[in-house]
């Protein structure tokens, strides 16, 4: 089952397994399905360029990193917003260095090809139908393909918690939450060690073990990001369109049930963190 929003730039997907049960795919899941299919097919049919890149936003699943590693392609992270993926494509074209392979974000947007500089659900729909037909020749459903990806790359699960804080007081509270975390970065989150703390407003990445500080290499933005042990992560940013502060997070499990449990534990920790700051 496929559905787009009214301007056809985001694609929602529900897939059926061999038992007739339907599964809703998150934007991370459908994006990874398409990334793996598009890059994998190109690799099989004509090979991949030495300077090819998969592009994702910083709040998008780390499974994308695993896909890039598997196919030995480059990976570029950009700030939230598909325009930043479009800017990378323009940069490839103007510099004559680098080739765009695929780009996506967790909020159900991706771009196949370079005909546009924004997410495109029309071409994504076509590609996903093509992928479904391809997997059917292997007696597989799209859900089977997703499970195969979990087995190959790891059982990644990503989620988000949002807190709505309206009005001038709410805006001040959102800033207070971010500044509190900025001044007091956690050493551990839900049992995961904080390996690096990224502050995109200060343009710094601090190694929490060595204290070494480097640049993010991205435009400044009021965003905090924590690289955690075991390929987990947490990102905090204010919404650009609503009076909300958003806590994005991701974990990697050893099975679907393990991933569910670890994600739920992370969610509880995030809520506890919010309550403590509030």
Regions found by a protein language model. Give the residues of each.
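Hydrophobic, small-residue-rich alpha-helical packing segments that form membrane-like cores
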Residues: 4, 11-35, 40, 44, ...
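Short glycine-rich anion-binding loops that position phosphate/pyrophosphate groups of nucleotides
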Residues: 5-9, 107-109
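Phosphate-binding and adjacent anionic-ligand microenvironments
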Residues: 21-23, 41-237, 244-246, 255-261, ...
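Active-site beta-strand/loop architecture of penicillin-binding DD-peptidases
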Residues: 250
């Amino acid at each position: 089952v496929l559905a787009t929003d009214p301007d056809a730039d985001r694609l929602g997907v529900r897939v059926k397994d061999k038992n007739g049960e339907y599964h809703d795919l998150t934007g991370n899941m459908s994006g990874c399905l398409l990334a793996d299919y598009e890059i994998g097919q190109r690799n099989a049919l004509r090979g991949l360029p030495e300077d090819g890149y998969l592009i994702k936003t910083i709040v998008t699943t780390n499974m994308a990193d695993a896909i890039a590693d598997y196919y030995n392609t480059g990976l570029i992270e950009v700030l939230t917003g598909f325009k930043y993926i479009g800017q990378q494509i323009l940069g490839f074209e103007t510099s004559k260095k680098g080739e765009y392979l695929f780009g996506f974000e967790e909020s159900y947007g991706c771009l196949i090809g370079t005909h546009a500089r924004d997410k495109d659900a029309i071409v994504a729909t076509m590609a996903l139908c093509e992928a479904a037909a391809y997997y059917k020749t292997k007696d597989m459903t799209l859900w089977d393909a997703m499970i195969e990806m979990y087995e190959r790359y790891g059982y990644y699960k990503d989620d988000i918690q949002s807190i709505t804080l309206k009005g001038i007081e709410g805006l001040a509270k959102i800033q207070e939450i971010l500044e509190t975390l900025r001044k007091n970065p956690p050493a551990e989150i839900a049992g995961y060690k904080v390996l690096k703390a990224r502050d995109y407003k200060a343009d710094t990445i601090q190694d929490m073990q060595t204290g070494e500080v480097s640049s993010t290499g991205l435009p400044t933005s009021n965003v905090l990001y924590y690289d955690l042990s075991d390929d987990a992560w947490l990102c905090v940013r204010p919404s650009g369109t609503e009076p909300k502060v958003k806590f994005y997070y991701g974990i990697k499990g050893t099975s679907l049930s393990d991933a569910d449990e670890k994600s739920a534990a992370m969610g509880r920790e995030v809520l506890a963190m919010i309550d403590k700051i509030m």
